Amino acid sequence: MPIRNAVFDVGGVLLEWNPPAVIARLHPDPATQAVIRQQMFEHADWHEYDRGGLSHDDAIVHFAKTTGLSTDDTRALIHATRESLAPIAGTVRLVEDLARAGVHLYLLSNMPASTFEFLVQRHSFFSHFKYLVISGQILLIKPDPAIFSHLVEKTGIVPAESVFIDDLPKNVVAARECGFEAIQFRDPDSCRAALRGYLPTFS
């Protein structure tokens, strides 16, 4: 089937995602950095925050307890992490070029609702997407097949006519198991080249 739709992840694809760099900037001590990584960003509870099972305020209190940081320092760290989500210029150009080519664009991201609300006010390129699925808004999260089913049910897109782009292998595998074509994102240029395999007239 011809590809009509492209479904993008956000963190690590459209926007930079590098928590260790943010942690190191705010907390120079290596031992503290390790605790924050392990007890916050790499912990299953961060996944739950992404899923919407923890509100923003509850997450601040919770991660202050697990990391030993003050609530003010935890709040500052989460805010700094949001601020660090800068656009990846080559991917933004790719989105703009796909939109001009008539490809239907969708978003499917693991992200707290409050973080997405912060980002959508900052970046105009989100307007290129016809429908946006944010895990924290619907209590579903990749790689659960249910979040892909949610996208299909809400939009009516055909998975076999859609290519999903994500930086994490487990999410790429999940998308393929749900019938989508899929590309593991490494950088904008290789992603563009991979898309040409699905969209021969796209440059």
Predicted regions and their residues:
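Active-site neighborhood of HAD-like aspartate-dependent phosphohydrolases
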Residues: 1-42, 66, 177-178
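Generic structural signal for small/hydrophobic residues in well-ordered secondary structure
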Residues: 9-12, 52, 107, 132, ...
